[in-house]
């Protein structure tokens, strides 16, 4: 096992890669490693607010997964505040060691019950244009599991509400039918459980744990990529549940057919139900999300300040809520009421001013249209002239390369075209770049222009 600082550095790198800049700067970078005792990593957090966030947003569970990726060790986090250090030391001193020679029965980690986040409900979910279809489908599944949309597959960028809806389904089913057996797990946790079952020779218990449920929720299944053994096991788990009429809900950052090295038979089964795209919230929805969060956390904040924060961040809900929490923490530290000026000061170090300059599909369309001297109407239209088709394909290629938009969303921005059209355009440009130096020059010029 690596030493504490090396382990924490590796874990932080994975946190930074998989979380927004705001969330990382506010919640992860402020954590301080204190001790690595066996498989327990003690982290000191600066405030109770931070510890609540780590728990409610499942950062502790993410840490377990990232530690396994970094060191192939089952590391469990212990979250303490600075004034609890002495209490932690006392507790450690009172812990009696296991008697020498006494056999310890290995307990597979998958036997531990996975709890849903009680705060993730349909009541606390803010509906907007980008998620209303996903919300409607989730509600249907929670009321009639295993009937209409099975599996239900949510896909979209980080922090847009996929996990919230997944938990909301589980919470609603448990509210309506308390005897419902619900299992929520991330794909990495599923993989770790599977590996643990092999190592402890408890494969049968593993299968009972995952197949004897009424609702299986699996988050971030894109991490099944390149894991042949895990995919094989999940294939049989999926079949067992589906054949028994049990509901399956999955999330990913992309469509199943876009996940590299995902078995065709899994791609096919994931398509049996309904796949729903969740897109970033518009301004009105972002303001509503912030107001909802402020009311839930009893934060006294003016409407104009909420509008200011919503105007600064347009990427995802997680980053929005992270910004609000940062403003709240800054207000408490400065002993000042929250106002727009204070919010601007609190968010200044995040360089959010650059967020408005981020590359978007409309910006790409505008630059490509001007570069090739075609109209936006033609670029997004159906004309098949070569002088228009090539710029259109280049714009689709750049949209795929420079934004996090899904294939259906890109197609929608180009006059409602099917996602297969986007795939064809991307593949066409990718192939042409290998033999066409002028095309390479055009692409490079456009990329330079878009990144300035």
UniProtKB/Swiss-Prot annotation:
GO terms for biological process: DNA replication initiation; regulation of DNA replication. One of its GO terms (cellular component) is plasma membrane. Residues 332-452 are annotated as: Domain IV, binds dsDNA. Residues 1-72 are annotated as: Domain I, interacts with DnaA modulators. It holds the Pfam family Bac_DnaA_C. Keywords: ATP-binding, Cytoplasm, DNA replication, DNA-binding, Lipid-binding, Nucleotide-binding. Transmembrane segments: none annotated. Residues 72-114 are annotated as: Domain II. SMART domains: AAA, Bac_DnaA_C. InterPro entries: AAA+_ATPase, Chromosome_initiator_DnaA, Chromosome_initiator_DnaA-like, Chromosome_initiator_DnaA_CS, DnaA_C, DnaA_dom, DnaA_N_dom, DnaA_N_sf. ATP binds at residues 159, 161-163. Residues 115-331 are annotated as: Domain III, AAA+ region. Its main location: cytoplasm. Belongs to the DnaA family. Oligomerizes as a right-handed, spiral filament on DNA at oriC. Domain I is involved in oligomerization and binding regulators, domain II is flexibile and of varying length in different bacteria, domain III forms the AAA+ region, while domain IV binds dsDNA. Plays an essential role in the initiation and regulation of chromosomal replication. ATP-DnaA binds to the origin of replication (oriC) to initiate formation of the DNA replication initiation complex once per cell cycle. Binds the DnaA box (a 9 base pair repeat at the origin) and separates the double-stranded (ds)DNA. Forms a right-handed helical filament on oriC DNA; dsDNA binds to the exterior of the filament while single-stranded (ss)DNA is stabiized in the filament's interior. This is Chromosomal replication initiator protein DnaA.
């Amino acid at each position: 096992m690596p030493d504490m600082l090396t382990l924490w550095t590796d874990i932080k790198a994975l946190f930074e890669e998989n979380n927004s800049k705001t969330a990382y700067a506010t919640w992860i970078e402020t954590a301080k490693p204190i001790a690595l005792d066996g498989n327990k990593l003690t982290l000191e957090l600066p405030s109770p607010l931070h510890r609540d966030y780590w728990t409610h947003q499942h950062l502790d569970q993410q840490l377990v997964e990232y530690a396994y990726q970094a060191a192939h060790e089952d590391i469990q986090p212990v979250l303490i505040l600075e004034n609890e250090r002495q209490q932690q030391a006392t507790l450690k001193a009172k812990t009696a060691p296991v008697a020498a020679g006494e056999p310890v029965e290995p307990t597979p980690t998958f036997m531990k019950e996975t709890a849903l986040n009680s705060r993730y409900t349909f009541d606390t979910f803010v509906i907007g244009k980008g998620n209303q279809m996903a919300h409607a489908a989730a509600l249907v599944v929670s009321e009639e599991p295993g009937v209409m949309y099975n599996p239900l597959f949510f896909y979209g960028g980080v922090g847009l509400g996929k996990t919230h809806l997944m938990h909301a389904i589980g919470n609603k089913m448990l509210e309506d039918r308390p005897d419902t057996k619900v299992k929520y797990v991330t794909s990495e946790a599923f993989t770790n459980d599977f590996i643990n079952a092999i190592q402890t020779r408890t494969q049968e218990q593993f299968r009972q744990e995952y197949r004897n449920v009424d609702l299986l929720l699996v988050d971030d299944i894109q991490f099944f990529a390149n894991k042949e053994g895990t995919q094989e096991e999940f294939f049989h788990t999926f079949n067992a549940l589906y054949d028994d009429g049990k509901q399956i809900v999955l999330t990913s950052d992309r469509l199943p057919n876009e996940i590299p090295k995902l078995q065709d038979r899994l791609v096919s089964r994931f398509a049996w139900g309904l796949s729903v795209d969740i897109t970033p919230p518009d301004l009105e929805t972002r303001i509503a999300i912030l107001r909802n969060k402020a009311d839930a956390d009893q934060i006294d904040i003016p409407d104009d300040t909420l509008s200011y924060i919503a105007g600064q961040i347009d990427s995802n809900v997680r980053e929005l809520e992270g910004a609000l929490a940062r403003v709240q923490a800054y207000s408490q530290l400065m002993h000042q009421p929250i106002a727009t000026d204070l919010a601007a000061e609190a968010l200044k170090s995040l360089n959010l001013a650059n967020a408005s300059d981020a590359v978007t599909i409309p910006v790409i369309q505008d630059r490509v249209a001007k570069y090739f001297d075609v109209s936006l109407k033609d670029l997004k239209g159906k004309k098949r002239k070569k002088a228009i088709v090539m710029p259109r394909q280049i714009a689709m290629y750049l949209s795929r390369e420079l934004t996090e938009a899904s294939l259906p969303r890109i197609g929608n921005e180009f006059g409602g075209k099917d996602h297969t059209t986007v795939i064809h355009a991307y593949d066409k440009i990718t192939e042409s770049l290998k033999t066409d130096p002028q095309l390479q020059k055009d692409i490079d010029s456009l990329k330079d222009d878009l990144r300035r």
